[in-house]
From Swiss-Prot:
S-S pairs: none
The keyword Ribosomal protein belongs to this UniProt entry's keyword annotation: yes
Stated role: One of the early assembly proteins it binds 23S rRNA. One of the proteins that surrounds the polypeptide exit tunnel on the outside of the ribosome. Forms the main docking site for trigger factor binding to the ribosome.
Keywords of the record: Ribonucleoprotein, Ribosomal protein, RNA-binding, rRNA-binding
GO molecular function: rRNA binding; structural constituent of ribosome
Source species: Zymomonas mobilis subsp. mobilis (strain ATCC 31821 / ZM4 / CP4)
Binding partners and assembly: Part of the 50S ribosomal subunit. Contacts protein L29, and trigger factor when it is bound to the ribosome.
Lineage per the UniProt record: Bacteria, Pseudomonadati, Pseudomonadota, Alphaproteobacteria, Sphingomonadales
The protein's name: Large ribosomal subunit protein uL23
A Gene Ontology biological process term: translation
HAMAP family cross-referenced by the UniProt entry: Ribosomal_uL23_B
Family membership: Belongs to the universal ribosomal protein uL23 family.
One term under GO cellular component: ribonucleoprotein complex
Length: 103
């Protein structure tokens, strides 16, 4: 298994694609939860392992949601946006991740 310089497996970066910053995800942060965009084939145990390794926090639970892509039109022709999988990660008491830094 390939590891980066800080000891985190490179495959963790393939699981967690980035934070999902919306008004709703900001409201959920009051309940000690963070929302991430994740790979479509990522499982809950893999997401938990990746978040714990990447951010050095303890994860209490992981809930996932698959948002189906909308049908849009471009130059009169219909196309479909990609599906997005989101993970709502609830952290243990006293743990926090600040995803808004650097935005």
């Amino acid at each position: 298994m390939a590891k980066s310089q800080d000891g985190v497996a490179i495959r963790h970066y393939d699981v967690v694609l980035g934070p999902h910053i919306t008004e709703k995800s900001t409201m959920v942060s009051e309940f000690n939860a963070v929302v991430f965009k994740v790979a479509a084939d990522a499982t809950k145990p893999a997401i938990k392992e990746a978040v714990e390794a990447l951010f050095g926090v303890s994860v209490k639970s992981v809930n996932t949601v698959i948002t189906k892509g909308k049908t849009k039109k471009w130059k009169g022709r219909p196309y479909r946006r990609s599906d997005v999988k989101k993970a709502i990660v609830t952290l243990a008491e006293g743990q926090s991740i600040d995803v808004t830094t650097g935005v």
